[in-house]
Design a protein with these regions (language model features):
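Feature responds to low-complexity, polar/acidic, surface-exposed segments characteristic
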Residues: 1-27, 40-56, 64-89, 96-115, ...
């Protein structure tokens, strides 16, 4: 969380949504995001916690963690389906950071977000670079938690395994420094175009 986002969180009072009770399992998470300015709810005072989230909505939430970069429009992205979209600058930011990769040149901003897509984005935010070869150790493969509806052939298999198993690992880090030509922001990111592979060494139960 950027310093200015944290400052906003620390200074903002509790946000009361009409449909989020203090006893709800997600109450603390909603409060954290609302106080940090990551989510705002709806004009009628509701949050709609059970409503599906679109890719654009989620990408904006993630981009707000980097809100110091959003005062200047971020253009020149690679996605062909976001020109003029309300979330264009947020998606372009995340694409430049290597967090959003899209699908054949499309960001599909109005599609509902899937759990697999969520896992992939969160892994990239946290710098967790993984693929199916990460689990090549036989003992690791035998010990890790798996899911009956997510087999190794699923595109998000490695991402979901990474997000749902606590484990030890080893890796080498390739770092590249990125600065866009307008000087809008500078970020140090892993070279996701040629990533190193995280090797799992032990599953924590």
């Amino acid at each position: 969380m950027k310093d200015q986002v944290k400052a906003r969180f620390d200074s903002k009072p509790t946000v009361n949504f009409s449909d989020v009770s203090s006893g709800a399992w997600y109450y603390d998470a909603v409060q954290m995001c609302a106080k940090a300015g990551i989510v705002a709810g709806y004009p009628d005072g509701s949050f709609k916690p059970n409503q599906a989230v679109t890719r654009a909505e989620f990408f904006k939430m993630v981009a707000m963690l980097y809100s110091d970069t959003l005062n200047t429009p971020i253009t020149g992205g690679i996605f062909k389906d976001i020109n003029g979209h309300w979330a264009e600058k947020y998606i372009n930011l995340l694409q430049k950071l290597g967090i959003v990769k899209g699908d054949n040149g499309s960001a599909r901003p109005n599609d509902n977000l899937t759990r697999g897509e969520t896992a992939a984005v969160m892994n990239r935010i946290l710098g967790r670079v993984v693929n199916n070869s990460s689990f090549s150790d036989a003992k690791v493969a035998a010990a890790m938690k798996t899911w009956p509806d997510c087999t190794s052939s699923h595109w998000a298999y490695a991402e979901i395994q990474e997000a749902t198993n606590s484990h030890d690992y080893t890796w080498d880090i390739n770092i590249l420094t990125y600065s866009d030509h307008n000087g809008i922001f500078k970020a140090i990111i892993k070279n996701l175009q040629n990533p190193v592979t995280e090797r799992w060494t032990y599953i924590k139960k």
